[in-house]
Amino acid sequence: MINRSHYTLFCPIWAFFGFVCFTYSSPVIPEIKSLEISEVSFQSEKDLPYLSKHYLSTKPVKHEDGIKLGDLMKESSKPEAILKIVDSFVATQKGIKAGKTDSFLVAKGGKLLLESYFRKGRINYPHYQMSITKSYTTLALGRAMQLGYLSMKELNKPIHQFLKDVKVDKFAKGASSITLQDALCMTSGIRIPKDRANARYIIKNPLKGQGHAQAIFEITEAVDSTKGQYKYQSADTSLVMQVIESVVPGGAEKLIREELFAPLGIDFYVWQEDLSGLPKAAAGSSLRSRDMLKVGQLVLNQGRWKGKQFIPADFIDRATSPLVKTNGNAHYGYFWWYESYEVSGKTYLSKQGRGAGGQFIIILPDIDVVAVITAHNKGMGGMLNQVCTALITAFSR
């Protein structure tokens, strides 16, 4: 007996939508047997073979990860909108940008309704994360706040006041005024010329620990005229991780592992170290797609997890608000993106974690939806718009 929940869009079950069947998905969810975390790396991910067949389930199966399950066909009034997106991933797997997608998951009301894997996607393989690592760093800061290690008021505190080992007298002009919120919004004003960030400086001035922060504050140009101006850069994220390291007993890595991820059931991941010895804040983590979904659900629930406030709601609200205008329709919060979409004359808000190459956590509060995408391709903005529009079409009433 064939499980119809594993057909792709073009299979007979979708005939009433007027499509023709071309391909079938695999009935077996793809995974790597006996995978050890030491085997997970950016390079090993590049070496993963393509799936011989993609995997699609509109009624996902249970795994020991605590995720609640549902049925897309029962929860969506227009499932074909989402399935068209899945088909675009399948039809171009070896071709254009949409075809370099590795996974696509959709949840509504806290239930996983659609789970699909393509190309290099595996349910148990942590996918490399680029700038979406910044979004996780924000949540680590929020978790530290919930645990009482700092307060909302301290977001306006100059960063150097958190760091006891830096030498303020060596800072560039204006750098001592940069606050934690400035860094979180990418508006610190820091501008580091390439000729100053060279090997000679690194050899002369060790970057371990707060030495990294010292270097950033020293070698930046004067920030008087640039402070408050948005510029997307890794220096700001590194400073935020430095603050987490300084205020949390045991440091940032322990906080992320024991206080942020472990309670969410995220125990199989990679988070690389920076030059400072701290966890990288700009990029460098690797998470499974289902674990990314948990992160999105946490944000959708205003920081609540399993009935308890896990991250302060007011912090989540501010972190995912449109605090800074960037380009086009997009705004920026605390390492989280904010964008709106108009469908059938109505505007829907979206909060997003984004990573270069195509890692996305899409949160649509108006329709109680979280979606996850992983991929290996840059310039997926157009595809992201199509996915958000499809999700809204599928679940709006």
Model-derived segments and spans:
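Mid-domain, small-residue-enriched loop/turn segments at the edges of structured enzyme/sensor domains
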Residues: 259, 263-289
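Active-site-adjacent helix/loop patches that line small-molecule binding or acyl-intermediate pockets
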Residues: 161, 171-266, 289-293, 297-298
